[in-house]
């Protein structure tokens, strides 16, 4: 079953104790429930959840990665534009006219464009899944069967594809931008390292390696992608 638990009650204690080096507000802190009150209507069977739920959650992370990519590209563009210091063995008198440095900025811009395109395509798949779910809905509450549909499957695969690609492209791009600035780009006052830290943190919340396996299994064996999964510490099985 799945339970919706209100956190504005004495039985719920939320702790902002996550100390990751990057993106904040990712909901990674500790939550402890002690005799928390749950209303009957807030308890549903797992099969009654909407089938594209995990894809929807992943889309939030993909959109965040796309935003990081665009922010990094925009910031490096402005930084190179205003850079006066250059190298004697560079390809131009000023950094802003150096074709090699311009190529670095161009790659960052291309990654940001690709990330936005991935998010848009995944959004279309999610829209189709939501439309299909609404078409199946009979107006009831707990009795509705949100069993997996072809649209749910496509939404799951679309976000998985995006995750596999962006989890590598965006952190790599956030590292490459420093090649356009030299050592001055590492000045703590600029804070350019935050783009990599944020991208790396977001990408780590749901490891892409598992989604790559799911995509391969679907492509080769026609396997259905898992829609319900969890993370936590495995409980050792008792032996006789």
Predicted regions and their residues:
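Hydrophobic packing residues in well-ordered alpha-helices of helical domains and bundles
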Residues: 62, 105-108, 152-155, 159, ...
